[in-house]
């Protein structure tokens, strides 16, 4: 018997987030699962709320997951999207650039996303860590852990304008920016690719009597069902999958290398103010 609603936390990186979680709330309530959600302005606040017991589940960014596990080593990732698995980030140059290898970026300007973006900053810069580059960060949506792609888009614009020699971005965003015209189609070239990594997950710290039911209903969502497909499209997936954690090792190493969080989950990045 569920004694209280399962409360989920999510970060309001875009106005559509309200529509998404209102839709999920209707989905769960229609299946007799008491459910509610709370929105946060940034991930650090959400992680602290999860660890502090103010919410039961957090829809966490990969960086938020890293911090959650440092603050609460027994934390679990219970589910994720099919589109959260096996992503890559790329370092891109203009097609006419003389740069052919990452080492040739030494001494040159490289544009990145916000300081807290795993895919637009931390992971690609870890790839370039042994190359002395001039980092130019485009600080859009700080605290949103890269969910707002504005920083990556601004880095891409700087690349197209010749203001930087290279730009870092999620591989999927490289395709998006070329499609939307931010980058000229065929006008860029990839010079480095990160190993595969995973993105968001539903994180839990403490048990709740409705948690198993929540996961079961989540995994049962069917993209072929016209009632749930629009909601899944908004959240950018075709299937929910069980959570896994081995796709975050690369980010854990980058967090340590750049001192973003301390070993106990304390925020340590210089000048980071979400």
List the model feature ranges, each with a label.
Residues 45-49, 151-158, 164:
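Short, hydrophobic alpha-helical packing/hinge segments within bilobed ligand-binding/sensory domains
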Residues 59-72, 129, 157-186:
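A ligand-binding cleft/hinge motif common to bilobed small-molecule-binding domains
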Residues 2-10, 81-93, 145-146, 180-218, ...:
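Periplasmic-binding protein-like
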Residues 5-31, 40, 63, 87-155, ...:
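Bilobed "Venus flytrap"/periplasmic-binding protein-like clamshell domains
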Residues 49-104, 116:
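Acidic, polar ligand-binding/catalytic clefts
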């Amino acid at each position: 018997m569920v004694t209280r609603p399962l409360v989920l936390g999510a970060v309001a990186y875009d106005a559509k987030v309200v529509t998404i979680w209102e839709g999920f709330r209707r989905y769960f309530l229609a299946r007799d699962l008491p459910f509610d959600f709370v929105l946060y302005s940034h991930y650090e606040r959400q992680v602290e709320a999860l660890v502090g017991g103010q919410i039961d589940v957090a829809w966490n960014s990969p960086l938020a997951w890293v911090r959650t596990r440092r603050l609460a080593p027994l934390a679990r990732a219970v589910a994720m999207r099919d589109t959260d698995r096996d992503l890559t980030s790329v370092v891109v140059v203009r097609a006419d650039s003389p740069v052919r290898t990452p080492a040739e970026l030494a001494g040159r300007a490289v544009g990145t996303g916000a300081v807290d973006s795993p895919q637009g900053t931390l992971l690609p810069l870890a790839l370039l860590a042994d190359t002395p580059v001039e980092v130019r960060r485009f600080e859009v949506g700080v605290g949103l852990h890269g969910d707002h792609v504005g920083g990556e888009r601004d880095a891409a614009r700087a690349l197209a304008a010749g203001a930087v020699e290279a730009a870092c971005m999620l591989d999927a965003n490289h395709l998006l920016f070329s499609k939307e015209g931010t980058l000229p189609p065929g006008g860029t070239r990839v010079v480095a690719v990160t190993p595969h990594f995973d993105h968001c997950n539903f994180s839990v710290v403490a048990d709740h009597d409705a948690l198993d039911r929540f996961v079961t209903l989540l995994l049962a969502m069917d993209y072929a069902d016209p009632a749930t497909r629009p909601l899944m499209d908004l959240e950018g997936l075709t299937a929910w999958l069980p959570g896994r954690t081995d796709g975050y090792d690369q980010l854990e190493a980058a967090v340590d290398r750049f001192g973003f969080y301390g070993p106990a989950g304390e925020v340590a990045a210089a000048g980071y103010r979400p």
